[in-house]
Amino acid sequence: METVTLTPTKTPELMFEGYSITPDAFAGKTAAEIAELPGHEGKIVMKLGDFFTVSGNGGATAADTNIHIAGDCTRVKYIGARMTAGSVTVDGNADMYVGGWMKGGKVLVKGNVDSFCGIQMEGGEIEVLGSAQNHVGCAYRGDWRGMKGGLIRIHGKAGNDIGTFMLGGTIIIEGDVFIHVSTHAEGGTIIVKGDVEGRVGGQMVKGEIYVLGKIMYMMPGFKKVDRVEKEVDGVKAVFDHYIGDLGERHPKSKGKEVYANLYVKAQ
Amino acid sequence: MSGGEIIIKGGFVIDPTQKIDGDVKDIAIKDGKIVEKVGSSAKVIDAKGKVVMAGGVDIHSHVAGPKVNAGRLLRPEDKLRSGTLRSSKAQKNGYRMESGFSIPSVFKTGYDYARMGYAFVMEAAMPPLMAPHVHEEIHDTPIIDEAALPVFGNNWFIMEYLKNHEVENTAAYIAWLLKVSKGYGVKIVNPGGTAAWSWGLNCLKLDDQVPFFDITPQEILTGLMEANEYLGLPHSIHVHQNNLGNPGNYPVTIDSLKLAEGVKARNKFGREQVMHSTHLQFHSYGGEGWGTFCSKAKEVMDYVNKQKNITIDLGCVTLDETTTMTADGPFEHHLHALNHLKWTNVDVELETAAGIVPYIYSKDVLPNAVQWATGLELALFAKDMNRTFITTDHPNAGPFTRYPRVIKWLMNKKSREAVLATMKNMDKVIDATNIHTIDRELNLYEIAQMTRSGPAKALGLAHIYGGLAPGLDANVSIFDLNYKDMPKDPEKIEAAFQRAAYFLKSGEIVVKDGEVLTHGHKKTIWVNPKMKEIPQVTRDVSEAFRKGTYTVGISNYPVREYLAPHPMVIDVDVEA
């Protein structure tokens, strides 16, 4: 197991597209070779070495490569995007698309992330100690194939459009969420430990949502069916169980229609 | 660019227009044209061990206009598959960012065609009302020369004239519309069917009645064919037939083709056909439903082979995730009901409509696999490759950037079998098609006929494109293929056609080693039929605008000069 340390030396004038900052790209390369890897700043092709000092060599494979960014990446996009194994740790904040399309490995951001964190993710794990902006684990704009697998855990709060078109995997937001949770989802699980303003599960076909706080405005397409006790991410509680979205088509299994389930902690 | 002298030395030249098949020859270029010889100071391009062909000619592709743009808006996710967005080389040469896969940006469209060595592309469906937009996009597409076919098959004026079989009036209307829209010829999409779609109906057979207009698809087709020959246009009618994409549609296809029997081509451009039947793959199916869906490519081609006054293009399914878009509005709604993906529809006043739906052609879905085989079979059953052209009906059956892959499949049985072997329903595909039993492998000469000499002749453009004879435009593509020692690995054929070693457009080197070097000097071609005015038609058109049947006034309808700033106008003297 090798660790490559990137230390930020300069704040990019425009956002820097750090699509090369993945264990897959670093594997098998020396520190000097890693510093030569490309990234765009606007329309200009720059090098990682223009913004970071690099120390340590990559491991033989992505799985043997850890990346440690010892500083802030508020203006660096695509950290860990499309990675398949290994790990990336960012000591500060990160910009958009952290762990987007990732298939495996782990990304840890100790600060906040911007939008599109874990977009269309297929596997692996993303942990954010701070908060996230919008579109956590959602589908790319226009696409109808969202997050398929893996785990995203945001310790702080998140904005809107969480898990849009989700098909699988788990998203846990420990703080509050604004609006649009699991819109169009056909699978997967979202756990919100704080409150949600509204629009939870709109046009949702299948999948699970747990809200441990309050939903200020419920969607009219959800119907309360019973009250159940469940343990969710280490918290045991009694939930009001809703099914929906009743306005949407639903698949049948063994002659019965399958609905999405929304569990809201009983007050 | 003009002036510079260039000589392409020592390549294996393939030019069906001069019956040259792999002879080692030099090609001389001066002032943007091919010439007999040049001076000793000419720039030398070494083509030794490489294949030299004319620039490619694409007879049918949806690359510009409101329909394509609606597709771009509907599918932002298509940009995820753009490939190389911004190479450092591109940046150095100062050219524009590329985006999109099945509906590429105008810049990517021009660059990708140029990288494949294509010189001319026909935009296959221009709604006349939207012609200004089509021309703006054409103008913004670098390098390649383009023209656009306005759609006539569901036009209210045309249907009014043809229900009384007024061919001369129809011709006068066509002549007017080609002029004001800067169009090239007569496109017909689902004749009568798209008009019927305004009533929620369709025309699936030749004798179905179009609601309100009291006319049939057959009358529209024969009437427009007569009007086209009356005018003597460079291209024939260009037909997307009725009942596209449905099981068991091949008898309608053959019946439509039969309408050309006995009709003679009348033009001064060397065109011999009176009907071009486009994306024939979508029209060559048997079976009573999707369960019994099968290829009828052999039956259709048996007819095409003996009927000399028709030409076809393939519309090959390339097994990609793509975006379907056509003026066949009812078909797109039908497709949306089949695949449940997002759908949009556009209605163009008195003229036409369009629908758009994303589509994923999967080798493991039986009907898609049969479609894949059907497209290739059409070419493999064809006897006259000069009447059979390679297309993917871009982007409907696949993006145009897959032409090299289609060429590979046509040239190499092993590569076809390799695809077949990975199909989930291989045995069922073999039962429903002929592809497994066909051993034919096309050669480079036949590929040059299908992509160069053939389409240029069918478009009436053989005096500019499609060959390497002196006097033609100096559009020359050089591919890294050894004619005498063709690669055993079929992937190398695809790679060679994907990125030309060189492409010269109008005598200027625009691509080298598959990289675009310059934006070139593109032209927009349109046809100007000089027909005497018929007062009734002039009155009908101005009355329609005056009464407000259109949302624009007649003075805002034509395409202004500035929208097509590099025109090449083909004048047609109409002898009544």
Across the structure, where does each feature detected by a protein language model lie?
Chain B
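Histidine/acidic residue-rich metal-binding segments in metalloenzymes
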Residues: 166-190, 194-388
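Flexible loop/turn segments at secondary-structure boundaries
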Residues: 64, 129-131, 154-158, 193-197, ...
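Histidine-centered catalytic micro-motifs
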Residues: 56-66, 236-244
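Active-site metal-binding motif and surrounding structural segment of the metallo-beta-lactamase
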Residues: 38-53
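Active-site microenvironment of metallo-dependent hydrolases
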Residues: 1-25, 29-30, 39, 65, ...
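Active-site neighborhood of phospho(di)ester-bond hydrolases with catalytic His/Asp-centered motifs
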Residues: 53-60, 122-124, 278, 313, ...
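Conserved beta-strand scaffold positions in the cores of enzyme catalytic domains, especially
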Residues: 7, 42-46, 146-148, 185, ...
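Divalent-metal coordination cores built from histidine and acidic residues
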Residues: 59-210, 558-575
